Design a protein with these regions (language model features):
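N-terminal capping/linker segments that flank leucine-rich repeat
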Residues: 4-12, 16-94, 111, 174
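Canonical leucine-rich repeat
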Residues: 83-84, 105, 126, 147, ...
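Leucine-rich repeat
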Residues: 89-91, 110-112, 131-133, 152-154, ...
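Conserved small/polar residues in nucleotide/adenosyl-binding loops
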Residues: 325-329
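Right-handed parallel beta-helix
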Residues: 94-121, 129, 138-140
Length: 329
């Protein structure tokens, strides 16, 4: 038995030696530097990760290596803290360091990186220059005040909600399909010519206007709880859902949005509502406004209508299949 243990130790030692000889020493040193930083609990980060030998990268929990290069790092929810420098990890494909207390992370020049999740940290800075393969970025619930997508030509999904942005510009992000910027401090949001953008969630901000020029693929739009008093939406043929409640909105124009099915514009100051060209409306909630007339006639797809707490004298739902069990007036 003793001989077996000795042989096993020799094998493991040899494997560790071979890995050390093969590994990228720059990457190892950068990770070692982070592992030795103080964690959120006051001890070292490597202790939080259950790493017993900081000099043996082959045994580091959460890190996957291939040909001596780090290709994946999964260190989520480990009470880690400090600054993580992954600059130049050109084989790295996936990083998940969410639910920690990191203050800075650098993934610039990670040219193979396709997925990055650094949400629920204390990040005030996120360096993501030259990450051409990045498709999905989650950085919500941090302390970011600025974010540039110029080095992310392939980005499709971005969730940067609950940060400290005052303005955000993603103009011309050709591949972007989903953008969530809810719960920030946005006063300005630019999404011009994002021709593949399908989902835009920008509620709970301080926007006074929103230009959707060129967003021809937009399907879901949520601008709840902003400060947009007047809004005109036109020629958005793919738009199926519009939520714009709690804006103190005085005018809302919806023209030629032929796919629109759900319209929620409650808790505003609307005195009229004429969603022209929206023959596919299925659900409308325009409650808590100042409407005196409402004409939704010939909406043959309409199933639910909530229009309570208005000043309605005339309500026209003729030639609509809406049942009175789904009508609140």
């Amino acid at each position: 038995m003793k001989r077996v243990f000795i042989m096993l130790a020799i094998v493991l030692g040899s494997a560790g030696l071979l890995f050390a000889q093969k590994s990228n020493q720059k990457e190892v040193k950068q990770l070692q530097s982070f592992l030795q930083q103080k964690s959120a609990k006051g001890d070292a980060n490597y202790i939080r990760l259950g790493i017993t030998d900081i000099k043996n990268p082959a045994m580091w929990k959460g890190v996957v290596w291939s040909d001596g290069r780090a290709i994946s790092i999964d260190w989520k929810d480990k009470e880690l803290a400090g600054e993580l420098d992954l600059n130049g990890f050109t084989a790295l494909q996936k990083v998940d360091c969410s639910r920690n207390q990191l203050t800075e992370i650098n993934v610039s020049n990670c040219t193979a990186l396709n997925t990055l999740n650094v949400s629920r940290n204390k990040l005030s800075e996120l360096n993501i220059d030259n990450c051409p393969a990045l498709v999905k970025l989650d950085c919500y619930k941090n302390r970011l005040t600025d974010l540039s997508l110029s080095g992310l030509p392939g980005l499709k999904n971005l969730n940067c909600s609950n940060n400290l942005f005052v303005e955000l510009n993603v103009n011309g992000a050709q591949q972007l399909q989903s953008l969530n910027v809810q719960g920030c401090h946005l006063e300005s949001l630019s999404v011009d010519s994002c021709e593949n953008l399908k989902n835009l969630y920008c509620g709970y901000n301080k926007l006074t206007s929103l230009n959707l020029f060129g967003t021809v693929s937009l399907s879901n739009l949520n601008i709840d709880d902003n400060e947009i008093s007047n809004m005109l939406l036109s020629k958005l043929p793919s738009l199926t859902s519009l939520i714009c409640s709690d804006n103190n909105m005085k005018t809302l124009g919806v023209l030629d949005c032929t796919s629109l099915a759900d319209l929620v514009c409650s808790y505003n100051d609307l005195t009229s509502l004429n969603p022209d060209g929206t023959t596919n409306l299925y659900f409308v909630d325009c409650s808590y406004n100042d409407l005196s007339t409402l004409d939704l006639s010939n909406r043959t797809m309409l199933q639910r209508l909530i229009c309570s707490n208005n000043q309605l004298n005339v309500l026209d739902v003729s030639f609509c299949p809406v049942s009175y069990t789904h009508l609140r007036a």
